[in-house]
Amino acid sequence: MAETWVSEIMTQALGCLQAFSSEFALEWESSDMKAAIFKLLLGWIVLSLTAILLAWKSYGPTVNSIYYRQGMGGQNGGTPEYPARFPVWESSSTESLKRHQE
């Protein structure tokens, strides 16, 4: 089922590309350059956004799993509050604080 969906999209995309290129060729011959350049830039933007969308659909979950790592690192891959190899030193109320004396 996925193959038919992809092939249908590719067929439509190729049809649009063929129509766009034939229209562009006709405008090029008639020297209507403003319209041709506008359509070329518009096509480039649409193509770029489509490529970004397809890349995000393909690699989006991987990027999210890297960005939002689970575990000791906290959110967004930060450092843990207390490194695992160093002990946590907690001061008790009976312990006096050391002060610098001159």
Swiss-Prot record:
List cellular component terms (GO): membrane
Q: Which keywords does UniProt give here? A: Membrane, Transmembrane, Transmembrane helix
Under InterPro entries, the record lists:
TCTA (IPR016560)
Instruction: Please list every transmembrane segment annotated in the UniProt record, as residue ranges.
Output: 36-56
- What family is reported? Belongs to the TCTA family.
This chain's protein is named T-cell leukemia translocation-altered gene protein homolog
Please name one Pfam family that this protein belongs to.
T_cell_tran_alt
Q: How does it sit in the membrane?
A: Single-pass membrane protein
Per the annotation, which location comes first and is thus the protein's main one? membrane
Which organism does this sequence originate in? Xenopus laevis (African clawed frog)
Subcellular location as annotated: Membrane
Domain of life, per UniProt, equals: Eukaryota
**GO biological process per UniProt:** osteoclast fusion
What gene does the UniProt entry assign to this protein? Answer: tcta
